[in-house]
Amino acid sequence: MEFPVELLINALIAGILLGGFYAAVTVGISISFGILDIVNIAHPAFIILGSYIAYIVNQRLGVDPILTSILVLPLFYYLGSLVYQVYYLSFEKRGQEALRGLAFFFGLLFVTEVILILVFGVDYRYVQAGYIDTTLRFGFLDLPMRMVVPFIISMLLLAALQWFLSKTFTGRAINAVAQDQLALSLMAADPIRIKRIAFAISIATAAIAGALLIIIQPVEPSVGREYIGRVFAICVLGGMGSLPGMIIAAMLLGIVESITSTFYGPSWAPAVAFGFLLITLAVRPAGLLGR
């Protein structure tokens, strides 16, 4: 029996596209958990909130979800700033962030879900855009635009964040705040302000990730929970605080899931993907590019 090379190549490309989306979903966690050491378990809820905002604007005004996500970036940034301020004053300042802080984000996750259920119900919602149902074909290679467009936007988002974190004073301060807050204070930078900015940026990325999610698939309020395990797994696999490592890990997880789904069925994909995670961490406990 001849090996289906064409099927494998399509699965590889689909995995890369899926990995790009996973990277956009995970980048916020990579900042809050990987750099700031804040276990924001509610991050997927903010992503779903971004999806619903994109849905409302798309249905009522016909605006493209990606454009909507860019327009609401300031809203999500200030929402993230507010959430961090509450978290800092209530838990971090008192040294209670470990358990009570985690409970705070769990509560935020479920409260957001309940509000969305009360407003929208549990029916799946989707958006309309000219490219969503379009597939580009190059010989045997299929490129669904509902995956290609999110991949391109993800890469642009990640490139912008990498530039910001490595080339600007605030970005370098964000990287430094996790390593030496005292040295940062001596540089006339307020560590709490820097952490608030970083956390706000992490929540702002959820607006874009939410728009990409609803382009790829219909959403309902609890869909975000499906991604909790994946995003933390990608963050740890890539190496804590390493944006390039996170991108590589997201691509690897996407490829493993895609190939497994293609040849063995979707039900095997999560098990094989997390098995791959465990093996990798057994070999490299610090992650792929962990420090």
Q: What is each residue range found by the language model?
A:
Residues 36-39, 60, 68, 78-123, ...:
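Short loop segments and helix-boundary regions at transmembrane helix junctions
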Residues 2-14, 21, 165, 169, ...:
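Inter-helical junctions in multi-pass inner-membrane proteins, predominant
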Residues 7-60, 88-96, 100, 239-243:
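Single transmembrane alpha-helix segments in multi-pass membrane proteins
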Residues 110-138, 262-269, 289-291:
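Extracellular/periplasmic helix-loop junction at the C-terminal end of a transmembrane helix
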Residues 43-46, 216-244, 249, 269, ...:
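Glycine-rich helix-loop "coupling/hinge" segments at transmembrane-helix boundaries
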Residues 5-14, 61-67, 96, 137-151, ...:
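Interfacial loop-to-helix junctions that mark the boundaries of transmembrane helices
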Residues 119, 179-186, 190-193, 263-291:
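Cytosolic-side transmembrane-helix boundaries in multi-pass membrane proteins
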